[in-house]
């Protein structure tokens, strides 16, 4: 394993983040209960192989009577050819893909985007890296949330908080995140399996929905301004009428 020789001081804390893809996989499968074939795709880098091993360990315990295929010895083009013609009721999992069989480097979001764009079946990842680029989403680790947590922790420490009092839990960085475009693609928009309060990205927001408060404020301002002008016109008319009557009275 990796052992850090970092020396901590009284203003430093360690944020321990535990990745548990098994929970992500289990939830993804619930979304597609008719699934009969499972494909775990991976690159050949050490981290790629680690995530493939984690997926394999879970599958060997929980998918005993299903068709499970592990792919880590293909280049990207061969993988794209594969996912274009997967059998019906298949699911694809891409835990990590940084290096293909031809030693061509990819970053995880790029790889999952390419695979998702060509796949005839739903594609899932284990984290928010690449979310919005093709994977459906699910119960995944959010590195964005980790970054936010670290930033907030730093502020607390600088304000005098005890570093040892700052702890991160699974709820701080795991969350339900879904891409609305993929939910529509796979007919999951109205699924009761999507937990309430989930984060939905790529929502189709109309101009009025996006700027309704601004539009409302402008309309309210125009209405009030119109009423004010109308009132001023009325007051001016009354003032002229009163002035005319005064003049007529004085001339008598």
Predicted features by range, described:
Residues 6-23, 129-148:
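Short beta-strand elements at the ligand-binding edges of bilobed clamshell
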Residues 173-176, 180-206:
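Juxtamembrane amphipathic/hinge helix adjacent to a transmembrane helix
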Residues 10-59, 168-180:
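An alpha-beta-alpha
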Residues 242-252:
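Conserved HAMP-HisKA connector
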Residues 32, 151-162:
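Short, hydrophobic alpha-helical segments
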Residues 200-244:
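Alpha-helical transmembrane signal-anchor helices
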Residues 1-4, 108-134:
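Venus flytrap/periplasmic-binding-protein-like
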Residues 37-42, 67-69, 89-105, 124-126:
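Periplasmic-binding protein-like
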């Amino acid at each position: 394993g990796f052992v850090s020789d970092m020396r901590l001081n009284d203003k430093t804390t360690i944020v321990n983040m535990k990745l548990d893809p098994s929970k992500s996989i289990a939830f993804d499968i619930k979304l597609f209960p008719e699934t009969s074939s499972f494909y775990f795709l991976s690159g050949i880098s050490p981290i790629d192989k680690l995530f493939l091993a984690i997926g394999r360990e879970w599958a060997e315990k929980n998918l005993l009577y299903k068709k499970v295929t592990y792919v880590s010895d293909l280049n990207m083009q061969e993988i794209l050819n594969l996912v274009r013609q997967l059998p019906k009721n298949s699911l694809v999992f891409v835990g990590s893909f940084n290096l293909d069989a031809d030693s061509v480097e990819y970053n995880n979001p790029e790889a999952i985007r390419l695979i998702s764009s060509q796949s005839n079946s739903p594609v899932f990842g284990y984290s928010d890296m690449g979310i919005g680029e093709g994977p459906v989403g699910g119960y995944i680790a959010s590195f964005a949330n980790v970054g936010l947590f670290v930033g907030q922790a730093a502020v607390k420490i600088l304000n005098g908080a005890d570093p040892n009092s700052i702890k991160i839990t699974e709820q701080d960085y795991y969350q339900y995140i879904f891409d609305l475009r993929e939910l529509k693609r796979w007919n999951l928009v109205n699924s009761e399996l999507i937990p309430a309060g989930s984060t939905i990205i790529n929502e189709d927001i109309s101009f009025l929905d996006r700027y309704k408060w601004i539009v409302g404020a402008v309309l309210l301002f125009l209405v009030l301004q119109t009423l004010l002008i109308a009132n001023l016109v009325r007051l001016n008319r009354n003032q002229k009428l009163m002035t005319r009557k005064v003049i007529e009275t004085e001339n008598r």
